Design a protein with these regions (language model features):
Chain A
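Extracellular/periplasmic bilobal clamshell ligand-binding domains
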Residues: 296-336
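Periplasmic-binding protein-like
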Residues: 105-108, 123-125, 185-193, 230-256, ...
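Mature extracytoplasmic/periplasmic domains
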Residues: 253-313
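Sec/Tat signal peptide C-region and signal peptidase I cleavage site
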Residues: 16-22
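Early extracytoplasmic/lumenal segment of secretory-pathway proteins
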Residues: 23-89
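Extracytoplasmic ligand-binding site segments that recognize negatively charged/polar headgroups
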Residues: 32-37, 75-76, 80-212
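A bilobed periplasmic-binding-protein/Venus flytrap-type ligand-binding module shared by bacterial periplasmic
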Residues: 126-133, 169-173, 247-261, 266, ...
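A ligand-binding cleft/hinge motif common to bilobed small-molecule-binding domains
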Residues: 84-90, 212, 217-235
Length: 336, 289
């Protein structure tokens, strides 16, 4: 009897040691359908390949990243952040330098690669419209800002980020190649003209709810959320005229205890296969240049990188530099 | 019967006083917890507000010197005040009814009220969004009945925030009020009626003054909780009637400007503590009883 207990204890101890040995890491993103796809397309394959468990956490919170790094207690190993934040945070010393001996950057879209970050996926702010709810859908940003021709509420992204300011300037007649440096006075003046008709969305899920219920029958949306909404049977019309692109980035907060696993995860997530699978699931464009050939041709046509004709690339470096200044002004304007 | 109840009450009171006078030690675990996990972090936040980005009071100057931020402060008090008043007006009759209902029924109603408190806050707030929006159930019904021809703006504004927050705050008014009203001896009301008071006079001159401590306790609780509320105003309000907690979240999460965030949070804390002190001084429910 005693022996049996001893054996049980011994094997339990062994089991414990074994469990502790298997590596774990945490991936943090924005939740919702996007993170579901990241889990399915990136994390599951990664775990199968490397035996490293990936715990999902979220939503991404820049305050938390700063707190973790300053306290030296980093629980997030890889984080999906907005591109302009990645550039800024790298400069502020909040991020680990990426190990490009593990991550193959030769195949990655160079627009989104820095010492501290690589692209995660890239998306466009497009004009979305619930066709059943309005007589006619706006086709251009000027239309979206025209309350006479297109009465009713319109939806815009609430947070200070590339997208809305650019849309306002385009609507006011600024040429797409003359957007930067941003004329903030002009942009806010234009935004003033539709302010009382704006409903702000602060998450992708909310934007879908607004459009589907026709609470705001049109507005500016992430293209992938419209693809997902259309798949549920809502008659969505998407106008790609002057679609404004921005990318999310993958970063590693400084001081992570799982740096090696983090680099391997990024290498896997940005591989052609993982990127193709994520793009197929979400309607966002891959940042791996080899992912194209792995994707269904018809679906390929609906992704942001195929809509290059009148496309506007948000200038991430400009935003990184002026993020605080624009943000302070943005929120003050909203609150007025 | 009444005698035994009083004697029992006295015994309990002695035991309670004994414990309070006897050992401060019982308080220690809770106190340590509060100091480590609340007081220390708050002080650290305060330090940031005067040290970041450089030592000085510039964060407070920026906060209090800007009309935008002052508007947010005013709006915060406006919303908290309106929510408090409406909660009391709606909650008082409910509490009264609960206090005089047969126990069997009051338990059931109470269970319903408390059950709603246990449901996830976010779920409840989203539910209001679906009800109140322009294409929501309420507007559709009113339009279907021909009572209105344009949807009423019930959400993304002050109306939405007030409705959503009042609903969430109601139990915090009803529960203390019910306790106070129950403790009022019905004989006093009977006596008033016998002396010729109308039922209105019974209410305004007897019941209302006697239940004032309950109103004060409930009002303070609701007002203070409302001042720091985040989720409901963020989802049901518009940006032009932003509340302070949202401003703090913007500073901390989006702008990563902890100096300003700390300053805003600290101003809120000071105002809240001041109000609490005023309430203790003038409307202390324990003293009044």
């Amino acid at each position: 009897m005693k022996n049996k207990i001893a054996i049980a204890l011994f094997s339990a101890a062994l089991g414990f040691a074994g469990a502790a040995h298997a590596e774990d890491m945490v991936f943090t993103s924005w939740g919702g359908t996007t993170q579901d796809a990241q889990k399915a397309s990136w994390a599951e394959g990664f775990t199968a390949e490397t035996k490293i468990n990936v715990t999902q956490d979220g939503p991404t919170d820049y305050g938390k990243i700063k707190a973790m790094v300053e306290a030296g207690n980093v629980n997030w190993d890889v984080v999906d952040v907005e591109g302009d934040y990645a550039v800024q945070a790298g400069k502020l010393g909040l991020l680990e330098k990426l190990d490009f001996s593990i991550i193959d950057k030769s195949k990655l879209d160079p627009r989104f690669v820095t010492d501290y970050s690589v692209g995660s996926f890239y998306y466009s702010f497009v004009i979305g419209c619930n066709k059943d709810a309005v007589k006619q859908c706006p086709k251009s940003w000027a239309d979206v800002f025209d309350v006479k021709k297109f009465p009713g509420k319109r939806a815009f992204y609430k947070w200070s980020a590339p997208g809305v300011i650019e849309a306002a300037l385009l609507a006011d007649g600024v040429a797409a190649d003359k957007l930067y440096p941003l004329d903030l006075d002009r942009a806010f003046k234009k935004l003033d003209t539709i302010k009382s008709d704006i409903i702000w969305w602060d998450s992708g899920a909310q934007s879908q709810q607004l459009l589907a219920s026709a609470e705001a029958p049109f507005g500016s949306f992430w293209n992938g959320r419209l693809t997902a909404l259309a798949a549920t049977g809502v008659t969505v019309e998407t106008s790609w005229t002057n679609n404004i692109t921005a990318a999310d980035s993958l970063v590693v907060p400084k001081g992570t205890k799982n740096k090696d696993a983090a680099m391997k995860f990024i290498a896997h997530a940005t591989s052609d296969q993982a990127q193709a699978s994520f793009a197929t699931a979400t309607g966002y464009a891959p940042i791996n240049l080899d992912a194209n050939v792995l994707m269904d041709g018809e679906l390929r046509q609906t992704l942001p990188d195929m809509q290059a004709e009148t496309q506007v690339n948000a200038d991430m470096d400009y935003w990184a530099e002026h993020r605080d200044e624009i943000g302070t002004r943005w929120y003050a304007w909203q609150a007025q | 019967m009444a005698m035994t109840a009083t004697a029992e009450g006295m015994r309990r009171k002695r035991a309670f006083v004994g414990a309070r006078g006897g050992s401060f030690g019982y308080l220690l675990p809770a106190l340590v917890l509060v100091v480590i996990f609340f007081i220390v972090p708050v002080l650290m936040l305060l330090m940031r507000s005067v040290l970041e980005p450089e030592p000085g009071l510039q964060n407070y100057k920026a906060l209090l010197g800007s009309t935008t931020y002052l508007r947010i402060f005013l709006n915060t008090f406006l919303v908290a005040g309106v929510v408090t008043i409406i909660s009391i007006v709606i909650g008082y009759p409910v509490a009264w009814l609960l206090a005089i209902m047969p126990e069997k029924w009051s338990r059931l109603v109470l269970a319903i009220i408390i059950l709603s408190m246990w449901t996830n806050l976010l779920t409840r707030t989203y539910a209001w969004m679906v009800l109140l929006q322009r294409t929501g159930v309420i507007n559709k019904t009113l339009m279907g009945l021909g009572l209105i021809d344009q949807p009423l703006p019930l959400v993304n504004n002050l109306v939405g925030v007030t409705i959503g927050m009042t609903y969430i705050m109601l139990p915090f008014v009803i529960l203390p009020l019910m306790g106070v009203i129950r403790a009022i001896d019905p004989a006093i009301l009977r006596a008033a009626a016998l002396c010729g008071a109308t039922s209105m006079q019974c209410f305004t001159r007897v019941l209302l003054p006697l239940s004032l401590p309950g109103i004060a306790a409930g009002a303070l609780m609701v007002f203070v909780m409302s001042l720091g509320y985040f989720v409901t105003p963020a989802l049901l309000g518009g940006t032009s009637n932003m509340m302070l907690a949202e401003l703090v979240a913007q500073f901390v999460q989006s702008l990563v400007n902890w100096g300003m965030g700390g300053a805003a949070a600290f101003v809120l804390l000071v105002v809240t503590l001041t109000l609490y002190a005023v309430q203790l001084r003038y409307f202390n429910p324990n003293k009044a009883r």
